[in-house]
Amino acid sequence: MTDQINKLDPDTAIDIAYDIFLEMAGENLDPADIILFNLQFEDHGGVEFVETADDWEQEIGVLIDPDEYAEVWVGLVNEQDEMDDIFAKFLISHKEEDREYHVVWKK
């Protein structure tokens, strides 16, 4: 018998990622990036729910099942509405009772 995963809806995943971003950005981003984000987020900011990539093992050193996680990006979008300056990529577990997350910060 397999356990059914109740996946996060995109809005919930976005809210979780953005809350974590606001809490941890000061410790993980370059001060210049924080200033850039604060100045441009109102006009060009984006928090996007994207298809979960299968290359997270390279980023975090752990093999994951993309179906068990949501991926959210926080960054700035350009004139073509493409996110071209990504400040953080979040991998958030769909398991509500044991929510875990991983973050890859802009270097």
From Swiss-Prot:
It comes from the Bacteria. InterPro entries: dsDNA_mimic_put, Put_dsDNA_mimic_sf. Belongs to the putative dsDNA mimic protein family. May act as a double-stranded DNA (dsDNA) mimic. Probably regulates the activity of a dsDNA-binding protein. This is Putative double-stranded DNA mimic protein HSM_1473. It comes from Histophilus somni (strain 2336) (Haemophilus somnus). The lineage of its organism: Bacteria, Pseudomonadati, Pseudomonadota, Gammaproteobacteria, Pasteurellales.
